[in-house]
C-alpha cells in the first residue's frame, strides 16, 4: 500500500469546489491524462455512483463513489490490478477552500512488478493535478460547463 498526499488552497467557496471536483466527469477539463469519463448510474452524484474512466496509461476502469458527505468529503475507488481509493477532504479557510487529497494505491498479482514505477509517476502527476484543478476552478471556467445528473 502506498498513500500519496497533497494539499492546496483554492480561492473558491467550498460548495463550488465540492460540486465541481466530486463529479469525475469534470476531470477531463483539468487532468491532461484523462481521455474519457462516463457516468454509468442514473441520478445525481452520490454514494454508490459509478463511472467508467479512461486514462492515457490504462484501459477502461470502473470507479465507484465510496464516500459522499457534501460539502466536506468524498472518495472514489476502483478495483483491478492496481486498486486505488482517492479520498478528498475540504475545509473552509481564509481565502477559500483547503483541499486535501489522499491517493491510496495497492498492487495485486503481476502489477506488483511495475508498481514502484506507477507510484513514481503518480506522485508527480497528483501534485501537478492539484495545480491544474486550482487553476480551472479559480479561472471561473469550471462553472461554465459542469455536467449535472
Which residues does each PLM region occupy?
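A short, structured loop/turn motif at beta-sheet edges
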Residues: 14-15, 42, 66-71, 89-98
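Beta-strand/loop substructures that line and gate deep hydrophobic ligand-binding cavities in soluble
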Residues: 77-128, 132-135, 144-146
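Glycine-centered tight beta-turn/hairpin loop motif at sheet-sheet or coil-to-beta transitions
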Residues: 1, 56-58, 81-83
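Short, highly charged C-terminal tails/helix-capping segments
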Residues: 34-39, 132-149
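Hydrophobic/aromatic beta-strand elements that line small-molecule binding cavities or substrate pockets
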Residues: 6-8, 61-67, 85-92, 103
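Short, hydrophobic/aromatic-rich segments at coil-to-beta transitions
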Residues: 44-52, 68-76
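Generic structural detector for well-ordered beta-strands
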Residues: 7-11, 38, 54, 64, ...
Amino acid at each position: 500500500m502506498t498513500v500519496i498526499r497533497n494539499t492546496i488552497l483554492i480561492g473558491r467557496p467550498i460548495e463550488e469546489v465540492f460540486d465541481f471536483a466530486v463529479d469525475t466527469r469534470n476531470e477531463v477539463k483539468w487532468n491532461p491524462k484523462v481521455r474519457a469519463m462516463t457516468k454509468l448510474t442514473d441520478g445525481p452524484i452520490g454514494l454508490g455512483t459509478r463511472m467508467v474512466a479512461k486514462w492515457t496509461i490504462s484501459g477502461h476502469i470502473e470507479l465507484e463513489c465510496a464516500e459522499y458527505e457534501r460539502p466536506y468529503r468524498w472518495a472514489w475507488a476502483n478495483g483491478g490490478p492496481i486498486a486505488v481509493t482517492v479520498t478528498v477532504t475540504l475545509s473552509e479557510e481564509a481565502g477559500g477552500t483547503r483541499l486535501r487529497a489522499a491517493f491510496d494505491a495497492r498492487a495485486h498479482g503481476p502489477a506488483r512488478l511495475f508498481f514502484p514505477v506507477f507510484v513514481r509517476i503518480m506522485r508527480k502527476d497528483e501534485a501537478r493535478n492539484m495545480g491544474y484543478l486550482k487553476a480551472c476552478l479559480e479561472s471561473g471556467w469550471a462553472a461554465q460547463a459542469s455536467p449535472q445528473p
